[in-house]
Amino acid sequence: MSEQATARAIIREAGTSYAAQAGFTLTDKPSQLYRLLVLSVLLSTRIKAEIAVSAARELGAFPTARRMREATWQQRVDALGRGSYVRYDESTATALGNGADLLLDKYGGDLRKLRKEAGGDVRRIKELLREVPNLGPVGIDIFCREAQAVWPELRPYFDKKALSGAEKAGLPKDAGRLAELVDAADYARFSAALVRLTLEKGLLEEIKAPA
């Protein structure tokens, strides 16, 4: 199987984004970008991805920074609990409220204004994202991996986990060379799929198994 064929197979079988798993389609709109940010915050902690995704679905009841700020702390805790995100529910509920305050005060609740302030500089986007409470390095990578679908200046975004997945699949461990294997429109799904190869035991073998 050629590298391009391998890449296509990986996307086809494992290229579901976290956003899609959480039940929303990412677009360059304030609500969807905010939901991606919340999802990235939830994935920043040492917790199973499926639990974070489940909690993000429940928090979809508060799809904007304003709605999140208007929700009571207990409403946030309850939503996290329904998603089984119970280990960090209280601290995360507080962080989400503080994060909503930050986004509303600094960007009017619109992450596109953060993008504009960064002026197309990926490093600056990541610096500004670091200001969001509880959004750690892992969460920032997740946000950028997925947001590259709608923010072209992030492309190609293949972080260390994605590159590790590429190496496991026998593909180049280089972002530029990986980008040559698929269309730019597929970078986000390709990156998500490569990360999944590092997390799900036996997935690569299933993908490479003869039909």
Would you name each region that the model predicts?
Residues 44-54, 102-109, 149-151, 199-206:
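Short helix-capping/linker segments at secondary-structure and domain boundaries
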Residues 52-56, 73, 90-100, 112, ...:
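Short, well-structured alpha-helical segments
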Residues 61-131:
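Alpha-helical ds-nucleic-acid-binding substructure associated with the helix-hairpin-helix region
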Residues 131-137:
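A structural motif
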Residues 30-62:
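Extended cationic-aromatic binding surfaces that line active-site or macromolecule-binding grooves
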Residues 36-45, 98, 189-200:
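Short, hydrophobic/amphipathic alpha-helical patches that form generic packing surfaces
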Residues 1-25, 122-124, 137-211:
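C-terminal accessory module of base-excision DNA glycosylases/AP lyases that mediates lesion recognition
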